[in-house]
């Protein structure tokens, strides 16, 4: 076997590993956001208000956010391939338990445990992918993994709605348990041993934003944006059902359009981060705020709402990659630790966004969650503009 052949084989194996990590992101994210597409049947089946059903997203995000810096630091000596395998095992079992849970409290407890696993993955996944490939391909590997977000939006959540409409929500989670198991097998087969790298103790993790002004600003930007975006997105199905009397088929198609736009936004973001990730964040935040406002002004027109969802998805896709790049630029020597803090901020904001938006939905109507989203994403935009010199 020639040296060139060995290098090709090694390169192919590396990118198979990146693909396995991307698939992992897909199953983690779809599991986290699955209730978004199933809120109506879930709340009806379990006899809880739709806002209470949104706690499935809230508690998942709370555990993913608050637990991750501790778990990442405590597992800093654990081989990352082994750690990812354990995380996927938790996801597989958790989806299985969710599918057979006899009551809502048990389901929430299960989601809480799954959230811990999800948060740790978000902290280590991108850095794992970047380590698998040559340094010159690290950015492309990161973009590939982040594309799993768009794939999840294009296929995962709409597919969950489709499966629920053909079977029921319990069967949908059972299928996702099987899918999680397949991804676990792929990770074991495709990813080589990856000893822990660039990890620090808990005390040093929490000291990072105290010492690092750039990282602290990026975390504030991310938290405000995610609060607004996911506060609105968590209740997009009830909003479309109320405003447009949308059928499950229309909602599935609309969310697929949103997800496809997210894939486009991720592609654009991959180009923007090499130019100016801060400006990319500004453009994306502006696009999300504008799309939410125009969504409210679109009235009952289904076509107009789909167009606004496409703008929303594209803008979100741009922001996603830009915020990861800004985090890396703020703390290049402690990226995994910084990403654990980013994950804490991100997922806690998902949880709080879903919680506050749920309160608005239950007390002032579903339309109010769109105003909530506009206010918070605009705040993220203003912070980014006001701190331009410190985030470049």
Protein language model regions, located:
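Helix-breaking motifs and short loop linkers at transmembrane-helix boundaries and internal kinks
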Residues: 47, 79, 100-106, 245, ...
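Paired small-residue
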Residues: 94-97, 105-114, 303-311
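Conserved MFS/SLC helix-loop-helix module at the cytosolic interface between two early adjacent transmembrane helices
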Residues: 66-105
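C-terminal transmembrane helical hairpin of 12-TM major facilitator-type secondary transporters
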Residues: 279-323
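Helix-loop-helix hairpin linking two adjacent transmembrane segments in secondary transporters
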Residues: 104-106, 134-191, 239
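Cytoplasmic helix-loop-helix junction between adjacent transmembrane helices
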Residues: 110-149
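Helix-to-loop junctions at the C-terminal end of transmembrane segments
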Residues: 67-80, 265-277, 361-362
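Intracellular juxtamembrane helix-capping segments at the cytosolic ends
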Residues: 121-133, 318-331
């Amino acid at each position: 076997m020639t040296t060139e052949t060995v290098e090709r084989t090694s390169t192919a194996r590396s990118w198979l590993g990146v693909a396995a990590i991307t698939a992992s992101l897909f199953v983690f994210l779809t599991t986290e956001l699955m209730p978004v597409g199933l809120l109506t049947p879930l709340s009806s089946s379990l006899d809880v208000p739709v806002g209470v059903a949104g706690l499935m997203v809230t508690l998942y995000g709370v555990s993913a956010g608050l637990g991750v810096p501790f778990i990442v630091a405590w597992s800093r000596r654990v081989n990352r391939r082994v750690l990812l395998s354990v995380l996927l095992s938790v996801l597989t079992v958790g989806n299985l338990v969710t599918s057979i849970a006899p009551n809502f409290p048990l389901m929430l407890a299960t989601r809480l445990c799954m959230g811990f696993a999800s948060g740790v993955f978000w902290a280590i996944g991108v850095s794992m992918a970047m380590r698998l490939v040559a340094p010159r391909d690290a950015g492309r590997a990161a973009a590939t993994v982040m594309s799993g977000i768009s794939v999840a939006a294009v296929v995962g959540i709409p597919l969950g709605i489709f499966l629920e409409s053909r079977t029921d929500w319990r069967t949908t989670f059972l299928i996702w348990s099987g899918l999680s198991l397949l991804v676990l097998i792929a990770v074991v087969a495709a990813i080589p041993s990856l000893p822990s790298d660039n990890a620090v103790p808990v005390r040093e993790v929490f000291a990072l934003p105290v010492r690092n002004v750039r990282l602290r600003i990026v975390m504030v930007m991310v938290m405000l944006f995610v609060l607004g975006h996911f506060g609105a997105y968590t209740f997009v199905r009830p909003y479309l059902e109320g405003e447009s009397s949308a059928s499950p088929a229309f909602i599935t198609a609309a969310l697929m359009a949103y997800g496809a736009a997210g894939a486009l936004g991720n592609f654009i973001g991959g180009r923007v981060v090499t130019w100016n990730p801060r400006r990319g964040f500004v453009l994306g935040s502006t696009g999300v705020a504008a799309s939410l406002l125009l969504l409210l002004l679109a009235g009952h027109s289904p076509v107009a709402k789909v167009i606004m969802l496409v703008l929303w998805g594209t803008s979100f896709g741009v922001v996603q990659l830009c915020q990861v790049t800004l985090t890396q630029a703020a703390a290049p020597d402690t990226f995994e630790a910084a990403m654990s803090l980013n994950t804490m901020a991100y997922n806690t904001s998902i949880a709080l966004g879903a919680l506050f938006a749920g309160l608005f939905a239950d007390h002032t109507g579903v339309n109010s969650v769109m105003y909530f989203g506009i206010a918070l994403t605009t705040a993220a935009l203003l912070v980014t503009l006001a701190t331009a010199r410190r985030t470049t």
